[in-house]
């Protein structure tokens, strides 16, 4: 612990204090708030995490408040435009020219958060965006019929919101998907919250002393000396190759928690701290909120709805599925049936058309069944 650290950062109820601040502007979504904050600030300050572990998509239908929630969570971090940078509209090549290292050689994305609001599939799946999401340093563009290498300095935490984005397979390895609460109960909480605000002076401002205290967090490396205790539980999952990426993501969530609580951790040297069991338990909560099944495949709310439709119908044809999909169009449904089949969440079978109108084969889909992810808390570790 550093003696000169702000008192807030030495408080075991540090996150509760932050929730009290967020409660001034947000209602519900307790775990979602923590994930956005941890992957944003903890992610950009962790020196020895995987470069893709701090990439997050906040997903929910249009009008659900995902942009508002994400903005209000990040607003508690001081240094907007210096420590965290928000853009509402951005082109797919912007990162190639933005803070170009030729013009700004000393500028870096390290220790920063990039928040992209309402990004579309074209932008998310673009080559340049893949480069920065991977933490790679160079992209090549063609200008005046010449190939030019441009350097991207550093790697930020990347948080984006999206309603209908379709992630290509390559992006699935680089992003976790945070699905928000779309329940009637959450709707009612939001209505009551804004009604109360309207009866008073509106939304309250965050306490500046709390915001300033967050400046006391510094970039550190994290050692997990108990990491050999939980790997076996991931080996038991039916997660195929993606377990390699998401196991590292789980490890890094432990590290992000330790980074946020660094002034309550043992310092091995001036730049390295040790994670504690409570960091493991916190990572369990965050990880099982992000990944609902043992396949460890990130899926959006709409993709989950599509799986549930197929599950309800049993073995069923594309036309029957499309007639039940009221939240998206035919093209989206075709695309996502194929994507979910590739991920192993649906099974595709060709059968004879028994209607008598055609001799063609029909594609049918069946839900494979998803086993809910279960990971033990520290007290239950063997």
Regions found by a protein language model. Name each.
Residues 33-37, 169, 173, 244-252, ...:
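Non-catalytic, well-ordered alpha-helical scaffold segments
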């Amino acid at each position: 612990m550093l003696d000169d650290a702000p008192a807030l950062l030495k408080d075991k109820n540090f996150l509760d204090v932050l929730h009290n601040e967020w409660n001034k502007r947000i209602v519900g979504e307790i775990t979602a708030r923590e994930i956005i904050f941890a992957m944003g600030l903890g992610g950009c300050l962790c020196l020895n995490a995987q470069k893709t572990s701090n990439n997050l998509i906040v997903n929910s239908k249009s009008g659900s408040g995902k942009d508002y929630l994400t903005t209000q969570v990040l607003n508690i971090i001081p240094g907007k435009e210096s420590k965290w940078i928000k853009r509402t509209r951005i082109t797919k090549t912007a990162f190639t020219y933005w803070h170009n290292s030729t013009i700004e050689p000393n500028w870096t994305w390290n220790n920063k958060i990039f928040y992209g609001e309402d990004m579309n599939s074209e932008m998310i799946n673009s080559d340049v965006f893949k480069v920065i999401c991977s933490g790679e340093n160079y992209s090549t563009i063609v200008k005046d019929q010449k190939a030019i290498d441009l350097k991207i300095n550093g790697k930020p935490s990347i948080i984006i919101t999206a309603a209908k984005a379709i992630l290509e397979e390559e992006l699935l390895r680089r992003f976790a998907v945070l699905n928000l609460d779309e329940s009637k109960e959450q709707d009612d909480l939001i209505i009551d919250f804004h009604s109360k605000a309207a009866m008073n002076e509106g939304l309250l401002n965050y306490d500046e002393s709390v915001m300033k205290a967050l400046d006391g967090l510094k970039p550190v490396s994290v050692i997990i000396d108990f990491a050999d205790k939980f790997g076996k539980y991931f080996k038991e999952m039916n997660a195929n190759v993606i377990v390699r990426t998401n196991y590292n993501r789980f490890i890094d969530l432990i590290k992000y928690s330790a980074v946020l609580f660094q002034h309550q951790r043992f310092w091995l040297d001036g730049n390295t701290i040790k994670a504690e069991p409570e960091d493991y338990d916190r990572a369990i909560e965050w990880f099982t909120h992000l990944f609902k099944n043992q396949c460890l495949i990130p899926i959006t709310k709409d993709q989950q709805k599509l799986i549930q439709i197929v599950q309800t119908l049993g073995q069923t044809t594309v036309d029957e599925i499309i007639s039940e999909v009221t939240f998206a169009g035919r093209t989206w449904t075709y695309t996502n049936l194929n994507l979910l089949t590739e991920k192993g969440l649906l099974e595709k079978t060709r059968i004879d058309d028994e209607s008598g109108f055609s001799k063609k084969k029909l594609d049918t889909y069946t839900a494979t069944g998803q086993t809910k992810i279960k990971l033990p808390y520290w007290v239950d570790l063997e």
